[in-house]
Amino acid sequence: MADRQSAAPRRDYIDILKGLGILLVVFGHFMEQYRLGSHLIGATFITIYWFHMALFCMCSGLVAHFSLRKLITQQLWLYLLGQAIMLAFRAVVLQEDFATSGGLLAAFLLPWRHMWYLYALLFWHLTLPVLTFLRDKLRLGGAVLGLALSVAISLWAGTIDWPFTLVRVFAFYPFYAFGVLFRPQIDLLDRAASRFWAVRVVPALLLLAGYGFRFWQMMQYEGQLSESAKIFNDVAYGEGYTMADRAVFLLVGIVTSIGLVAALGNCRMLAPLGKRTLAIYLLHMPILTFLVDLGFYEPARQMPVPVIVAWVLLEALGCLCILNSEPVNRVFNWLANLWYKPRKKTS
Protein backbone atom coordinates (compact mmCIF):
# COMPACT_ATOMS: atom_id res chain seq x y z
CA MET A 1 0.00 0.00 0.00
CA ALA A 2 1.39 3.38 -0.92
CA ASP A 3 2.54 5.42 2.05
CA ARG A 4 0.24 8.37 1.37
CA GLN A 5 -2.73 6.02 1.20
CA SER A 6 -1.86 3.90 4.18
CA ALA A 7 -4.32 5.86 6.29
CA ALA A 8 -7.14 5.67 3.72
CA PRO A 9 -10.52 4.67 5.19
CA ARG A 10 -11.53 1.04 4.90
CA ARG A 11 -14.31 0.15 2.50
CA ASP A 12 -16.67 -2.03 4.50
CA TYR A 13 -17.92 -4.06 1.57
CA ILE A 14 -14.41 -5.41 0.94
CA ASP A 15 -14.17 -6.75 4.50
CA ILE A 16 -17.64 -8.26 4.04
CA LEU A 17 -16.63 -10.04 0.83
CA LYS A 18 -13.36 -11.22 2.40
CA GLY A 19 -15.38 -12.60 5.31
CA LEU A 20 -17.57 -14.53 2.90
CA GLY A 21 -14.50 -15.65 0.99
CA ILE A 22 -12.67 -17.06 4.01
CA LEU A 23 -15.82 -18.91 5.12
CA LEU A 24 -16.04 -20.55 1.71
CA VAL A 25 -12.32 -21.38 1.71
CA VAL A 26 -12.52 -23.17 5.05
CA PHE A 27 -15.80 -24.97 4.40
CA GLY A 28 -14.67 -25.94 0.90
CA HIS A 29 -11.43 -27.47 2.14
CA PHE A 30 -13.06 -29.24 5.08
CA MET A 31 -15.74 -30.87 2.89
CA GLU A 32 -13.35 -31.89 0.09
CA GLN A 33 -12.64 -35.29 1.66
CA TYR A 34 -16.29 -36.28 1.18
CA ARG A 35 -17.13 -34.66 -2.17
CA LEU A 36 -16.87 -37.85 -4.25
CA GLY A 37 -19.20 -39.83 -2.02
CA SER A 38 -22.22 -37.53 -2.10
CA HIS A 39 -23.85 -35.49 -4.87
CA LEU A 40 -25.01 -32.93 -2.30
CA ILE A 41 -21.51 -32.39 -0.92
CA GLY A 42 -19.91 -32.64 -4.36
CA ALA A 43 -22.27 -30.08 -5.90
CA THR A 44 -21.75 -27.73 -2.96
CA PHE A 45 -17.97 -28.08 -3.25
CA ILE A 46 -17.97 -27.37 -6.99
CA THR A 47 -20.28 -24.38 -6.52
CA ILE A 48 -17.88 -22.89 -3.96
CA TYR A 49 -14.92 -23.44 -6.27
CA TRP A 50 -16.58 -21.64 -9.17
CA PHE A 51 -16.09 -18.27 -7.54
CA HIS A 52 -14.57 -18.22 -4.04
CA MET A 53 -10.98 -17.55 -5.14
CA ALA A 54 -12.16 -15.14 -7.84
CA LEU A 55 -13.77 -13.17 -5.01
CA PHE A 56 -10.61 -13.27 -2.90
CA CYS A 57 -8.38 -12.23 -5.79
CA MET A 58 -10.68 -9.34 -6.69
CA CYS A 59 -10.63 -8.10 -3.09
CA SER A 60 -6.81 -8.20 -3.11
CA GLY A 61 -6.84 -6.08 -6.25
CA LEU A 62 -9.33 -3.62 -4.76
CA VAL A 63 -7.01 -2.77 -1.85
CA ALA A 64 -3.69 -3.02 -3.71
CA HIS A 65 -1.30 -0.04 -3.82
CA PHE A 66 2.23 -0.48 -5.07
CA SER A 67 5.00 -0.16 -2.53
CA LEU A 68 8.27 -1.99 -3.09
CA ARG A 69 9.12 -1.54 0.60
CA LYS A 70 5.89 -3.24 1.67
CA LEU A 71 6.25 -5.94 -0.97
CA ILE A 72 9.60 -6.97 0.49
CA THR A 73 9.18 -6.29 4.21
CA GLN A 74 5.61 -7.55 4.59
CA GLN A 75 4.33 -9.64 1.69
CA LEU A 76 7.53 -11.54 0.91
CA TRP A 77 8.14 -11.90 4.65
CA LEU A 78 4.64 -13.31 5.17
CA TYR A 79 5.11 -15.83 2.41
CA LEU A 80 8.46 -17.01 3.76
CA LEU A 81 7.09 -17.11 7.32
CA GLY A 82 4.09 -19.13 6.18
CA GLN A 83 6.29 -21.50 4.21
CA ALA A 84 8.55 -21.97 7.25
CA ILE A 85 5.50 -22.86 9.38
CA MET A 86 4.28 -25.30 6.73
CA LEU A 87 7.75 -26.82 6.37
CA ALA A 88 8.00 -27.43 10.12
CA PHE A 89 4.51 -28.95 10.12
CA ARG A 90 5.33 -31.25 7.20
CA ALA A 91 8.61 -32.35 8.77
CA VAL A 92 7.45 -32.85 12.36
CA VAL A 93 3.78 -33.84 12.07
CA LEU A 94 3.53 -35.42 8.62
CA GLN A 95 7.13 -36.71 8.70
CA GLU A 96 7.43 -36.00 4.99
CA ASP A 97 10.49 -37.16 3.06
CA PHE A 98 11.56 -34.03 1.17
CA ALA A 99 14.19 -35.92 -0.82
CA THR A 100 11.40 -37.47 -2.90
CA SER A 101 9.82 -34.09 -3.74
CA GLY A 102 12.77 -31.96 -4.88
CA GLY A 103 14.63 -31.40 -1.63
CA LEU A 104 14.33 -29.16 1.41
CA LEU A 105 15.06 -25.89 -0.42
CA ALA A 106 12.35 -26.52 -3.01
CA ALA A 107 9.91 -27.44 -0.23
CA PHE A 108 10.64 -24.11 1.45
CA LEU A 109 10.54 -21.87 -1.63
CA LEU A 110 7.67 -23.41 -3.61
CA PRO A 111 4.16 -23.07 -2.17
CA TRP A 112 2.58 -25.94 -0.27
CA ARG A 113 -1.11 -26.39 -1.07
CA HIS A 114 -3.00 -23.20 -0.12
CA MET A 115 0.20 -21.13 0.05
CA TRP A 116 -0.02 -20.68 -3.73
CA TYR A 117 -2.17 -17.58 -3.13
CA LEU A 118 0.46 -15.65 -1.17
CA TYR A 119 3.00 -16.83 -3.75
CA ALA A 120 0.85 -15.52 -6.60
CA LEU A 121 0.29 -12.16 -4.90
CA LEU A 122 4.03 -11.48 -5.01
CA PHE A 123 4.00 -11.77 -8.80
CA TRP A 124 0.70 -9.97 -9.28
CA HIS A 125 1.79 -6.97 -7.22
CA LEU A 126 4.75 -6.46 -9.55
CA THR A 127 2.27 -5.60 -12.31
CA LEU A 128 0.52 -2.91 -10.26
CA PRO A 129 2.34 0.08 -11.83
CA VAL A 130 1.10 -0.97 -15.28
CA LEU A 131 -2.44 -1.70 -14.10
CA THR A 132 -2.79 1.56 -12.19
CA PHE A 133 -1.38 3.52 -15.14
CA LEU A 134 -4.04 2.04 -17.41
CA ARG A 135 -6.76 2.74 -14.84
CA ASP A 136 -5.74 6.25 -13.79
CA LYS A 137 -4.40 7.67 -17.05
CA LEU A 138 -6.57 5.98 -19.67
CA ARG A 139 -9.69 5.70 -17.49
CA LEU A 140 -12.36 3.19 -18.50
CA GLY A 141 -10.78 2.43 -21.86
CA GLY A 142 -7.50 1.61 -20.16
CA ALA A 143 -9.27 -0.61 -17.64
CA VAL A 144 -10.99 -2.55 -20.41
CA LEU A 145 -7.69 -2.89 -22.28
CA GLY A 146 -5.90 -4.07 -19.14
CA LEU A 147 -8.55 -6.68 -18.38
CA ALA A 148 -8.48 -7.93 -21.97
CA LEU A 149 -4.69 -8.30 -21.80
CA SER A 150 -4.84 -10.12 -18.46
CA VAL A 151 -7.45 -12.54 -19.79
CA ALA A 152 -5.38 -13.11 -22.93
CA ILE A 153 -2.30 -13.87 -20.80
CA SER A 154 -4.29 -16.29 -18.65
CA LEU A 155 -5.76 -18.11 -21.65
CA TRP A 156 -2.39 -18.30 -23.41
CA ALA A 157 -0.60 -19.50 -20.27
CA GLY A 158 -2.80 -22.58 -20.18
CA THR A 159 -0.98 -23.88 -23.25
CA ILE A 160 2.20 -24.33 -21.18
CA ASP A 161 2.86 -26.77 -18.34
CA TRP A 162 4.61 -24.20 -16.14
CA PRO A 163 7.30 -25.17 -13.64
CA PHE A 164 7.64 -23.73 -10.12
CA THR A 165 3.89 -23.86 -9.38
CA LEU A 166 3.19 -20.95 -11.74
CA VAL A 167 0.04 -22.40 -13.33
CA ARG A 168 -2.38 -20.71 -10.92
CA VAL A 169 -0.34 -17.50 -10.91
CA PHE A 170 -1.38 -17.04 -14.53
CA ALA A 171 -4.80 -18.72 -14.36
CA PHE A 172 -6.20 -16.51 -11.58
CA TYR A 173 -4.45 -13.26 -12.51
CA PRO A 174 -7.46 -11.69 -14.34
CA PHE A 175 -9.48 -11.65 -11.11
CA TYR A 176 -6.79 -9.63 -9.34
CA ALA A 177 -6.36 -7.36 -12.36
CA PHE A 178 -10.13 -6.81 -12.47
CA GLY A 179 -10.12 -5.60 -8.86
CA VAL A 180 -7.30 -3.15 -9.55
CA LEU A 181 -8.56 -1.88 -12.91
CA PHE A 182 -12.24 -1.48 -12.07
CA ARG A 183 -11.92 -0.26 -8.48
CA PRO A 184 -13.73 3.06 -9.15
CA GLN A 185 -16.63 1.30 -10.87
CA ILE A 186 -16.89 -1.38 -8.17
CA ASP A 187 -16.87 1.28 -5.44
CA LEU A 188 -19.62 3.08 -7.36
CA LEU A 189 -21.66 -0.13 -7.58
CA ASP A 190 -21.43 -0.58 -3.81
CA ARG A 191 -22.60 2.99 -3.20
CA ALA A 192 -25.48 2.55 -5.66
CA ALA A 193 -26.54 -0.70 -3.99
CA SER A 194 -26.60 1.02 -0.60
CA ARG A 195 -28.98 3.70 -1.96
CA PHE A 196 -31.26 1.75 -4.30
CA TRP A 197 -32.77 -1.54 -3.14
CA ALA A 198 -33.21 -2.82 -6.70
CA VAL A 199 -29.44 -2.68 -7.30
CA ARG A 200 -29.02 -5.05 -4.36
CA VAL A 201 -32.04 -7.31 -4.84
CA VAL A 202 -31.89 -7.94 -8.60
CA PRO A 203 -28.27 -9.27 -8.63
CA ALA A 204 -29.07 -11.41 -5.58
CA LEU A 205 -32.04 -12.99 -7.34
CA LEU A 206 -30.04 -13.55 -10.53
CA LEU A 207 -27.24 -15.24 -8.60
CA LEU A 208 -29.70 -17.44 -6.72
CA ALA A 209 -31.47 -18.40 -9.95
CA GLY A 210 -28.29 -19.11 -11.91
CA TYR A 211 -26.46 -21.03 -9.23
CA GLY A 212 -29.64 -22.74 -8.08
CA PHE A 213 -30.31 -24.05 -11.58
CA ARG A 214 -26.74 -25.28 -12.02
CA PHE A 215 -26.85 -26.90 -8.56
CA TRP A 216 -30.06 -28.69 -9.53
CA GLN A 217 -28.40 -29.93 -12.73
CA MET A 218 -25.50 -31.37 -10.76
CA MET A 219 -27.86 -33.08 -8.34
CA GLN A 220 -29.55 -34.79 -11.32
CA TYR A 221 -26.26 -35.97 -12.82
CA GLU A 222 -25.97 -39.76 -12.76
CA GLY A 223 -22.18 -40.02 -12.84
CA GLN A 224 -19.55 -38.84 -10.38
CA LEU A 225 -18.90 -35.09 -10.03
CA SER A 226 -15.13 -35.27 -10.35
CA GLU A 227 -13.86 -32.93 -13.11
CA SER A 228 -10.84 -31.84 -11.07
CA ALA A 229 -9.10 -29.77 -13.77
CA LYS A 230 -12.20 -27.62 -14.34
CA ILE A 231 -12.66 -27.22 -10.58
CA PHE A 232 -9.10 -26.31 -9.58
CA ASN A 233 -7.72 -24.80 -12.81
CA ASP A 234 -4.22 -25.87 -11.79
CA VAL A 235 -3.07 -27.76 -14.90
CA ALA A 236 -2.23 -27.00 -18.51
CA TYR A 237 -4.79 -27.66 -21.22
CA GLY A 238 -5.27 -31.29 -22.10
CA GLU A 239 -7.91 -33.95 -22.36
CA GLY A 240 -10.98 -32.80 -20.44
CA TYR A 241 -9.71 -29.24 -19.89
CA THR A 242 -9.60 -26.67 -22.69
CA MET A 243 -9.13 -22.95 -23.24
CA ALA A 244 -12.91 -22.62 -23.43
CA ASP A 245 -13.20 -24.12 -19.94
CA ARG A 246 -10.80 -21.54 -18.54
CA ALA A 247 -12.61 -18.72 -20.36
CA VAL A 248 -15.92 -19.80 -18.82
CA PHE A 249 -14.26 -20.03 -15.40
CA LEU A 250 -12.93 -16.46 -15.72
CA LEU A 251 -16.28 -15.11 -16.90
CA VAL A 252 -18.27 -16.84 -14.15
CA GLY A 253 -15.82 -15.69 -11.47
CA ILE A 254 -15.88 -12.03 -12.52
CA VAL A 255 -19.66 -11.86 -13.03
CA THR A 256 -20.32 -13.60 -9.71
CA SER A 257 -17.93 -11.30 -7.85
CA ILE A 258 -19.69 -8.23 -9.29
CA GLY A 259 -23.05 -9.66 -8.28
CA LEU A 260 -21.85 -10.35 -4.74
CA VAL A 261 -20.62 -6.76 -4.35
CA ALA A 262 -24.15 -5.58 -5.05
CA ALA A 263 -26.02 -8.34 -3.23
CA LEU A 264 -23.99 -8.69 -0.02
CA GLY A 265 -22.14 -5.38 0.29
CA ASN A 266 -24.24 -4.48 3.33
CA CYS A 267 -24.04 -7.84 5.16
CA ARG A 268 -21.99 -6.40 8.03
CA MET A 269 -21.98 -9.54 10.15
CA LEU A 270 -19.24 -10.87 7.84
CA ALA A 271 -17.00 -7.79 8.18
CA PRO A 272 -15.26 -8.75 11.47
CA LEU A 273 -14.27 -12.10 9.97
CA GLY A 274 -13.03 -10.33 6.84
CA LYS A 275 -10.59 -8.29 8.93
CA ARG A 276 -8.98 -11.46 10.32
CA THR A 277 -8.38 -13.61 7.27
CA LEU A 278 -4.59 -13.95 7.56
CA ALA A 279 -4.36 -16.39 10.47
CA ILE A 280 -7.38 -18.34 9.26
CA TYR A 281 -6.01 -18.72 5.75
CA LEU A 282 -2.50 -19.69 6.84
CA LEU A 283 -3.37 -22.16 9.59
CA HIS A 284 -6.64 -23.84 8.60
CA MET A 285 -4.90 -26.14 6.11
CA PRO A 286 -2.36 -27.63 8.55
CA ILE A 287 -5.19 -28.12 11.06
CA LEU A 288 -7.26 -29.90 8.41
CA THR A 289 -4.31 -32.02 7.27
CA PHE A 290 -3.58 -32.96 10.89
CA LEU A 291 -7.19 -34.08 11.41
CA VAL A 292 -7.10 -36.15 8.23
CA ASP A 293 -3.75 -37.67 9.19
CA LEU A 294 -5.11 -38.63 12.61
CA GLY A 295 -8.07 -40.39 10.99
CA PHE A 296 -10.76 -37.97 12.18
CA TYR A 297 -12.46 -38.08 8.77
CA GLU A 298 -12.73 -41.86 8.48
CA PRO A 299 -15.57 -42.60 10.97
CA ALA A 300 -18.05 -40.42 9.07
CA ARG A 301 -17.37 -41.79 5.58
CA GLN A 302 -19.96 -44.57 5.85
CA MET A 303 -22.49 -42.45 7.71
CA PRO A 304 -25.64 -40.87 6.20
CA VAL A 305 -25.08 -37.56 4.41
CA PRO A 306 -26.70 -35.43 7.19
CA VAL A 307 -24.19 -36.88 9.68
CA ILE A 308 -21.29 -36.08 7.33
CA VAL A 309 -22.56 -32.52 6.85
CA ALA A 310 -22.88 -32.04 10.60
CA TRP A 311 -19.36 -33.44 11.11
CA VAL A 312 -17.87 -31.09 8.50
CA LEU A 313 -19.68 -28.09 9.99
CA LEU A 314 -18.50 -28.97 13.49
CA GLU A 315 -14.86 -29.27 12.46
CA ALA A 316 -14.86 -26.21 10.21
CA LEU A 317 -16.61 -23.98 12.75
CA GLY A 318 -14.27 -25.15 15.50
CA CYS A 319 -11.28 -24.26 13.34
CA LEU A 320 -12.77 -20.85 12.53
CA CYS A 321 -13.49 -20.08 16.19
CA ILE A 322 -9.91 -20.86 17.22
CA LEU A 323 -8.23 -18.97 14.38
CA ASN A 324 -10.60 -16.00 14.63
CA SER A 325 -9.80 -15.51 18.32
CA GLU A 326 -8.18 -12.33 19.58
CA PRO A 327 -4.95 -13.93 20.92
CA VAL A 328 -4.22 -15.72 17.63
CA ASN A 329 -4.84 -12.61 15.56
CA ARG A 330 -2.82 -10.38 17.87
CA VAL A 331 0.19 -12.64 17.38
CA PHE A 332 -0.27 -12.82 13.60
CA ASN A 333 -0.75 -9.07 13.23
CA TRP A 334 2.48 -8.54 15.14
CA LEU A 335 4.31 -11.06 12.97
CA ALA A 336 2.88 -9.60 9.76
CA ASN A 337 4.19 -6.13 10.58
CA LEU A 338 7.41 -7.19 12.27
CA TRP A 339 9.54 -5.56 9.56
CA TYR A 340 6.98 -3.28 7.92
CA LYS A 341 6.00 -0.05 9.66
CA PRO A 342 3.62 2.25 7.72
CA ARG A 343 4.98 5.73 7.37
CA LYS A 344 2.96 8.47 8.98
CA LYS A 345 1.00 10.63 6.59
CA THR A 346 2.60 14.03 6.22
CA SER A 347 0.45 17.14 6.09
Model-based region annotation:
Residues 1-347:
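Alpha-helical transmembrane segments and their immediate juxtamembrane cytosolic regions
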